[in-house]
């Protein structure tokens, strides 16, 4: 089961978060609500390793709370939501940063961009260096710089989040590691001929072993689908390969005086392989709102 990103929606007491939650419908997120109060800091301290991103409605309490988080070395991806004026000031004036230099701001009027902004906040957080973790505003002289423990937590949090994103994105990172020069259409005529012969031979082995149990069929199918995926082979090419092989088998059965009906069972093999390949291609299609820097960061 693919892990969901754990979001904590932080609001002032009495705030109705319905419009915000409506922008986060789907299977990407697990959303929990949290309001400012005496237990706010204690809760974040106790659960900091389970939080993937904070979505914070700006309020009067923001500055004090997030200064405490910064001084405690609790650094998490964060999106601040607020009115236009507050967002514009915070984005343009570094001194207005409340938490750290990777925080993001979003105007309430643009809530439809919330999912994108969360992705951007996570991407910037993954690029956050331990030495640049805190905001660039002057530090309180009564507090020392973040110690090695705080820096270690940041690195741990980045690694944990990157692993979850790698799982969440599935084959997406692998997709961008494919080398186009190895695509079937990019091969020379001789290489294409060699590829076709090996491709048909592998498919024949899978078909013949599918119902016999002689070979580890699941492993063979996985290897075959990987071969097709990295060669950018289309589903129609696999279908064509299957039909040619079935014609060959049909002729052999006809010569032996046997019924061709058994060949209908081999459609299960085709369905199994096509389903595997389609799932790989489906999961490798990047969402339009996914920052490319996020892809490169988790490679």
Curated annotation (Swiss-Prot):
Residue ranges of every copy of the KaiA N-terminal domain listed in the record: 1-169
Pfam family, one: KaiA
Cysteine disulfide links: none
GO biological process terms held by the UniProt record: circadian rhythm
Superkingdom: Bacteria
Domain notes: The N-terminal pseudoreceiver domain (PsR, approximately equal to KaiA N-terminal) binds oxidized quinones. The KaiA C-terminal domain mediates interaction with KaiC, homodimerization, and is responsible for the clock oscillation function.
Record function comment: Key component of the KaiABC oscillator complex, which constitutes the main circadian regulator in cyanobacteria. Complex composition changes during the circadian cycle to control KaiC phosphorylation. KaiA stimulates KaiC autophosphorylation, while KaiB sequesters KaiA, leading to KaiC autodephosphorylation. KaiA binding to the KaiC CII domain during the subjective day yields KaiA(2-4):KaiC(6) complexes which stimulate KaiC autophosphorylation.
Protein name (record): Circadian clock oscillator protein KaiA
